Swiss-Prot record:
A GO MF term: ATP binding
A Gene Ontology cellular-component term: cytosol
Record domain ATP-grasp: where: 119-308
Record: residues binding ATP: R114, K155, S160, S161, G162, K163, G164, Q165, E195, G196, V197, V198, E203
Name of this chain's protein: Formate-dependent phosphoribosylglycinamide formyltransferase
Pathway(s) it belongs to: Purine metabolism; IMP biosynthesis via de novo pathway; N(2)-formyl-N(1)-(5-phospho-D-ribosyl)glycinamide from N(1)-(5-phospho-D-ribosyl)glycinamide (formate route): step 1/1
A Pfam family it matches: PurT_C
Keyword set, alphabetical order: ATP-binding, Ligase, Magnesium, Metal-binding, Nucleotide-binding, Purine biosynthesis
Source organism phylogeny: Bacteria, Pseudomonadati, Pseudomonadota, Gammaproteobacteria, Enterobacterales
Assigned EC number: 6.3.1.21
GO BP of this protein: 'de novo' IMP biosynthetic process
Function: Involved in the de novo purine biosynthesis. Catalyzes the transfer of formate to 5-phospho-ribosyl-glycinamide (GAR), producing 5-phospho-ribosyl-N-formylglycinamide (FGAR). Formate is provided by PurU via hydrolysis of 10-formyl-tetrahydrofolate.
Family affiliation: Belongs to the PurK/PurT family.
Length: 392
């Protein structure tokens, strides 16, 4: 039996978000729908989820002592990481002290860096992956590239949104690629992964829910990447029944091995009927924002339902849908959005995240569309995103 208290009352059920960006904001909103008290934590003030939380705190989440202090102050029933850059050893300590880390502290630690999850997938679970080597010095990096061959990709073991990644075609790129990887790591300079290039027809995110009533799958989400970050996503991605079956089997193995209840974003390469594991996030995925319009339960609603111990039951997908990011480039601490009236309409929505500032290129919103076909939905979403004029 799941007992939920009322926010701001003595018996409140309290959820603490570690990371308060646009994904955390939607998780906070879903918690609010169930009367759950929300505490938003991030490294900067006025982060998106803080706008819809009951309280907020600004800390360095890589500082284990600071993390413990805010947890002891707020006494959350659930600690919900939204990002990778967290003091995961402290999360493990807190979990050992009977706090509930979502989906579990082990999953958060393993997926915080690419080495942990790659070794789990390839070596423990024996799943198909790209060829790979790890290196923690420039000389070992050069040896790894020679071993893997060209072309290959280098990534910091700890980074997100494409930071620090380089597609390497020749030896002339090696010095700069190493330097860029050292600059792009979330927790500073360090270890990298060198991966062989996988031949694939398309990439998918298989949003997979581990809940009290078993493992559930959303329809596969296709997406287009540029500079290591997603630009458009769509659902459903068409694929053969055999490929879908293989994708679901890989995702099931990964989420059950990681453990805990919640939604996982399992990233996979698909080539005809073959499926290759890429990465997994133990939390809602940015490409999954399409589910805000494509499903009866968004990825955020599914995540909250699962970690609260509620059954999922089933997931209804409404048909062809797409998302397209609103990604301006400017410098401002007073952003405004013009021409919004031309970005909304029948089966057409936008979300503006409320980020407090921009300095360069930053994702500030997303357009969402449905249509008779995925191709039409993508075009509608892209057109709507382009209508929003970001000023500062």
């Amino acid at each position: 039996m799941t007992l939920l208290g009322t926010a701001l009352r003595p018996a409140a059920t309290r959820v603490m978000l570690l990371g308060s960006g646009e994904l955390g904001k939607e998780v906070a909103i879903e918690c609010q729908r169930l009367g759950v008290e929300v505490i938003a934590v991030d490294r900067y003030a006025d982060a998106p989820a803080m706008h819809v939380a009951h309280r907020s705190h600004v800390i360095n989440m890589l500082d284990g002592d600071a993390l413990r202090r805010v947890v002891e102050l707020e006494k959350p029933h659930y600690i919900v990481p939204e990002i990778e850059a967290i003091a995961t050893d402290m999360l493990i300590q807190l979990e050992e002290e009977r706090l509930n880390v979502v989906p579990c502290a082990r999953a958060t630690k393993l997926t915080m860096n690419r080495e942990g999850i790659r070794r789990l997938a390839a070596e423990e679970l024996q799943l198909p992956t790209s060829t790979y080597r790890f290196a923690d010095s420039e000389s070992l990096f050069r040896e790894a590239v020679a071993d893997i061959g060209y072309p290959c990709i280098v990534k910091p073991v700890m980074s997100s949104s494409g930071k620090g990644q380089t597609f390497i075609r020749s030896a002339e790129q090696l010095a700069q690629a190493w330097k860029y990887a050292q600059q792009g790591g979330r927790a500073g300079a360090g270890r990298v992964i060198v991966e062989g290039v996988v031949k694939f027809d398309f990439e998918i995110t298989l949003l997979t829910v581990s809940a009290v009533d078993g493992v559930h799958f959303c329809a596969p989400v296709g997406h287009r990447q540029e500079d290591g970050d997603y630009r458009e996503s769509w659902q459903p991605q068409q694929m053969s029944p055999l490929a879908l079956e293989r994708a679901q089997e890989i995702a099931r193995k990964v989420v059950l091995a990681l453990g805990g209840y919640g939604l996982f974003g399992v990233e996979l390469f698909v080539c005809s009927d073959e499926v290759i594991f890429s990465e997994v996030s133990p939390r809602p995925h940015d490409t999954g924002m399409v589910t805000l319009i494509s499903q009866d339960l968004s990825e955020f609603a599914l995540h909250v339902r699962a970690f609260l111990g509620l059954p999922v039951g089933g997931i209804r997908q409404y048909g062809p849908a797409a998302s397209a990011v609103i990604l301006p480039q400017l410098t401002s601490q007073n952003v405004t959005f013009d021409n919004v009236q031309n970005a909304v309409g029948a089966d057409l929505q936008i979300r503006l995240f409320g980020k407090p500032e921009i300095d360069g290129s930053r994702r500030l919103g997303v357009a969402l569309a449905t249509a008779e076909s995925v191709v039409d939905a993508i075009e509608r979403a892209k057109h709507a995103a382009g209508q929003v004029k970001v000023q500062g």
